[in-house]
Amino acid sequence: MSADTETLARKVREEVIKPEQSTLISPDRQSPSLLRREATVEPRFELFHFVFSVCSQKVRGTLMEKGVTFGSNELTILPPQNENYCPQYVRLRLRSEAAAKHRPVSSFTGQSSVDSEGFDPLVVPTLVDHETGRILADSKAICLYLCDALSGGTDLLPADIREAVLKQVQLADTTPHVALLYGADPDGDRRPESMQAVMPGIHAHKIDAVRRNIPLADGDPLLLEAYQHKIVKEEAAASFVINEPQMRTAISKAEQLVTDLDRDLGASTGPWLFGDRFTLADLFWAVSLYRFLWLGYSGFWKDGAGKPRVEAYANRLFARPSVKDAIIQWPGHPPSENVIHLLSNA
């Protein structure tokens, strides 16, 4: 690992991450209970993430399916902490491959895909590969990197169906999760009451938090530019989530994706999208379907929606160990009355 990358990662661990939030995850200990400072091994991979982030969930699930030990560094990205806005963390992401490859974020579409949104240096997750010195900051790219770099564990990206799997991964990656989280259904808010209560004004709080960090960017034009782009994005988001036509379009797109998924499941000869082989596509859909369920949008496939294949598929996904450990049972996940039945069966 390059000394520069090591320094950047260490500064985030030491200056941003709370000691109790820096842990070691291993195949035989998949909950964040072993403090990093008490661990006897230095992991190759180090993940900076947040419990509730769908992008973080995809990467955690991939790491668990591959059966590797990794360092877990949890940031609190909600106001008022907004630890992901700290200069040390933003500088780490600005040194990533995604920062060099993608245009800066400057709009809001309701998705979290870098391909559609542009690169946002103030979000999670970020993966550091201590062996190669590479910094990766786009969840889809991180998962593909792990699939290609690691031969052990589940073969999530089989060579003979690689392109077909990638097509499904891309579809799941374009789901407008962010819009459905921050914005209400104009025809009746389906989100958990606890979430409804904290959402009004949240983008203004995020913008204020960014502005409080701007003085810390003095003498660092790249960091200052990152903060400025973030403000533009959050201003656009604040307008988007109260725009009824845009919200209806986002909800309609999400439901259509589930309809298309049901069609694709009908072509499979096994329990997963590609027969008996559990792939990265299934993992990405697990994250999407669980978020829909959590938010109250399970009507996309239940309650007379006529999509029994998706309903059965979702049940299988939610029972998979990596999905339970990386998403459903990860400590600190916000509560929702829509998933109590899954937690009670854990």
Swiss-Prot record:
Q: Which GO terms describe its biological process?
A: catabolic process; mitochondrial fission; mitochondrial fusion; protein targeting to mitochondrion; response to toxic substance
Could you tell me what this protein does?
Answer: Catalyzes the degradation of 2,5-dichlorohydroquinone (2,5-DCHQ) into hydroquinone (HQ) via chlorohydroquinone (CHQ). Is involved in the degradation pathway that allows S.japonicum UT26 to grow on gamma-hexachlorocyclohexane (gamma-HCH or lindane) as the sole source of carbon and energy. However, the conversion of CHQ to HQ by LinD seems not to be essential for this degradation pathway, because the conversion rate of CHQ to HQ is much lower than that of 2,5-DCHQ to CHQ. CHQ is more efficiently degraded by LinE in strain UT26.
Listed as disulfide-bonded, the cysteine pairs are none
Factors inducing expression: By 2,5-dichlorohydroquinone.
Q: Name one GO molecular function term.
A: transferase activity
User: Any other noteworthy remark?
Assistant: The mechanism of this reaction probably involves a glutathione transfer: the halogen is firstly removed through substitution with glutathione, which is then removed by displacement of the aromatic moiety by a second glutathione molecule, producing oxidized glutathione (GS-SG).
Kindly report, in one word, the top-level EC class recorded for this enzyme: transferase
Pfam families, from UniProt? Answer: GST_C_2, GST_N_2
Task: Look up and give the organism this protein is from.
Answer: Sphingobium indicum (strain DSM 16413 / CCM 7287 / MTCC 6362 / UT26 / NBRC 101211 / UT26S)
Q: What reaction does this enzyme carry out catalytically?
A: 2,5-dichlorohydroquinone + 2 glutathione = chlorohydroquinone + glutathione disulfide + chloride + H(+); chlorohydroquinone + 2 glutathione = hydroquinone + glutathione disulfide + chloride + H(+)
Q: What is its EC number?
A: 2.5.1.-
Similarity-based family: Belongs to the GST superfamily.
Biological pathway = Xenobiotic degradation; gamma-hexachlorocyclohexane degradation
The record places domain GST C-terminal at 189-335
Keyword Transmembrane among record annotations:
no
This chain's protein is named 2,5-dichlorohydroquinone reductive dechlorinase
List the InterPro entries hit by this protein, alphabetically. Answer: Glutathione-S-Trfase_C-like (IPR010987), Glutathione-S-Trfase_C_sf (IPR036282), Glutathione_S-Trfase_N (IPR004045), Thioredoxin-like_sf (IPR036249)
